[in-house]
Every structure is written in C-alpha cells, then in structure tokens.
Swiss-Prot record:
Induction summary: Up-regulated by EOBII. Triggered by EOBI in flowers via the regulation of its promoter. Circadian-regulation with peak levels occurring at the end of the light period in flowers; this expression is monitored by LHY binding and repression to cis-regulatory evening elements in its promoter.
Metabolic or biological pathway, per its Swiss-Prot or TrEMBL entry: Aromatic compound metabolism; phenylpropanoid biosynthesis
Active site annotation, chain numbering: K135
Lineage: Eukaryota, Viridiplantae, Streptophyta, Embryophyta, Tracheophyta
Residues the record marks as site: Confers substrate specificity: V88, Y91
Name of this protein: Isoeugenol synthase 1
GO MF: nucleotide binding; oxidoreductase activity
Gene designation per UniProt: IGS1
pH dependence: Optimum pH is 6.5.
Regulation acting on activity, per entry: Inhibited by zinc and copper ions. Repressed by 4-bromo-cinnamyl acetate.
GO annotation terms (biological process): circadian rhythm; phenylpropanoid biosynthetic process
Function description: Involved in the biosynthesis of the floral volatile isoeugenol. Catalyzes the synthesis of the phenylpropene isoeugenol from coniferyl acetate. Phenylpropenes are the primary constituents of various essential plant oils. They are produced as antimicrobial and antianimal compounds, or as floral attractants of pollinators. Isoeugenol is a characteristic aromatic constituent of spices and a floral volatile compound.
This enzyme's EC code(s): 1.1.1.319
Entry annotated with the keyword NADP: yes
Catalytic activity: (E)-isoeugenol + acetate + NADP(+) = (E)-coniferyl acetate + NADPH
C-alpha cells in the first residue's frame, strides 16, 4: 500500500536528534527507514531498545558503515529522501554520503546534518567557526554534486539549552548569564525541529532553499528566559554574570571540548548571531510562515513541561581538532 509520501531514510537515527526525526517521519505518514552502524556485542542496551521501538513503529532498519559505498548506494535506491542527523565528529563523513547519493541517482532531496546556526551568514570564535566551516564544506559539496537539497537552520534546541542554562532537573536557584543577557536567540523544541524538517524534506517549495526555524514566540534573551522561568516556578533566581572578555579568554585557554562550548555560548548569547541577518525571499524560508497550521511549542509552553517532567537531553559531542 502506497501513501503517496516520500520514503525517508534517516542517517544517525539512534542519536539525539535522530530519534526525534524518526518519530516525526512516522507520525507524518512517511515510509521510514534508518541506516545504523552494525550492532556489537557490547552495544548499549538503550540503543538495542530504541531499535526495537523503531521496528515496532514500522521502521525498516539497514545496518552498515558509512564507508560501505556499494551498500549505501543500494540502500539509497530504495528511498526518495535522505536526512542526515550525524553528530559533529561525523560531519565530513557526509562526503561519502554525497558520493553515494550521486551514484544512486534517484534521491529527490538531501538534508545534511546542520540543525544549528545559519552557517553561511554568521561568524564565530575560532573553535566554533571550525565546526561551522565543516558544515559549509558539506553544503558546497552537495551543491557541486547537483543533488536537490534543503539546508535546515534550526538555531538552538530548546530542551538542550534550557537544561544547560536553567538546570530545571536540578531545581537550581542559581543561573549563569553570559554577557549582559540581553542578546536575542532562537530556541526551538526538538520535536518541532524534526516535524518542520520532515515537512520541508518532501515539500517542492523547500527544494534548494534554506529552511530557517525562527518562530516569533521562540525569540528570547537569557534574561527573558530567566524571567519566564521565575514566573513559571514562582521562585527568584540568583544570577551570576560572565563577561564577554572572560568567555573569549575561556575559548582560547580551556581544554577541548569545553573551549567549543564557550565559543558557542559567545556566538549565540553574546554576539546574538542568530538574529544578526535578514531573511531573503529568493534564498530563505521561515518554517512557521511556511507551515502556519503547525502548532509549535513556544519557549513558555516548554517551560511548563519542565515544571512537571523536565526532559534530559544528551550533551553534544565534538571531534578533537587535528594538530
């Protein structure tokens, strides 16, 4: 039985964002596939349980390495859309994915792993800029290969950064403010990022465009976030400020991967990079405008979730820079 919807393959399906992507694809009615690394004897039990859950939802699972070119080509010929949610250490491995997509010749849309800042229009401190540069390499390689694409700029993930900034699971009354706390950022709930991505990946309007997820209710500063959390909990938080100069110094002096974390905090919450450019009609699509009937979770609504049962996000992983 055919649904008329594109067959979607997720790379990195068992990772943090990949899990959301698989479930969004299923819920939106797409035949859904996952390409995952072969299981080992010491594979994590949680991964095994997740794969069983995927299978129970009807997900078709392929096992293989990204280095297995012929296997990738064969798998890609079975689907219409490839969405990568590979982690930072694997970004450049997507060059192998691009080569396989090019040879397969049937993929209608490729969404490379980004889901952060708009890499072509922001600059960052060196440690974070290196991450952005790798994403740019994948964009250029995708374009050069002539593969239909949608690049997704998700800005910041709500569950991840609310946990990092407000510590709702620990019920902490102390928070750290980076810089003045006034710079605006965009926080989007992971479920919404996945839903918008799946919608755009099978939408002709989003072909060869940048999807920027920037809903108006999710544009907040650190001080806005603290104020909203105080109203939600009825408590008063004690704020400690770290200056821009201190953050820059930390990004230059502390060990990996904390130096990348410092660079990211500077870029988002001090430089305000996510609000530093205007969207263009011929290049960009704003997700909440493209899909006005989709009810996204606002930051304030997410904080109410945290009051009852705060999610536990997974910390991001980064590749050790070569020397």
């Amino acid at each position: 039985m055919t649904t008329g919807k594109g067959k979607i393959l997720i790379l990195g399906a068992t990772g943090y964002l990949g899990k959301y992507m698989v479930k969004a694809s299923i819920s939106l009615g797409h035949p859904t596939y996952a390409y995952v690394m072969p299981l080992k004897k010491n594979s994590d039990d949680s991964k095994l349980q997740l794969l069983k859950e995927f299978e129970s939802l009807g997900v078709t699972i392929f096992y293989g390495e990204l280095s297995e070119h012929d296997k990738l080509v064969a798998v890609f010929k079975e689907v219409d859309i490839v969405i990568s949610t590979l982690a930072v250490p694997q970004y450049l491995e997507q060059l192998k994915v691009i080569e396989a997509i090019k040879e397969a010749g049937n993929i209608k849309r490729f969404v490379p792993s980004e889901f952060g800042n708009e890499v072509d229009r922001v600059r960052a401190l060196p440690r974070f800029q290196a991450v952005l540069d790798n994403k740019k390499k994948i964009r250029r390689a995708t374009e050069a290969a002539g593969i239909p694409f949608t690049f997704v700029s998700a800005n910041s993930l709500t569950a991840y950064f609310v946990d990092y900034l407000l510590h709702p699971r620990q019920k902490s009354e102390q928070v750290t403010i980076y810089g003045s706390g006034d710079a605006k950022a965009v926080l989007n709930y992971e479920e919404d990022v996945a839903a918008y991505t799946i919608k755009a990946a099978d939408d002709p309007r989003a072909a060869n465009r940048v999807l920027i997820i920037k809903p108006p209710k999710n544009i907040v500063s650190q001080l806005d976030l603290v104020s909203s959390w105080e109203k939600t909990t009825g408590s008063t938080l004690k704020m400690t400020h770290i200056s821009e100069q201190e953050i820059i110094k930390l990004s230059e002096s502390i060990n990996f991967p904390e130096n990348i974390h410092a660079s990211i905090l500077h870029n988002i919450f001090i430089a305000g990079a996510q609000l530093s450019f205007e969207l263009t009609q011929d290049h960009d699509l704003e997700a909440s405008e493209l899909y006005p009937n989709y009810n996204y979770t606002s930051v304030d609504e997410y904080l109410k979730i945290c009051l009852v049962n705060p999610p536990k996000p997974k910390l991001a992983t980064y590749a050790q820079p070569s020397t």
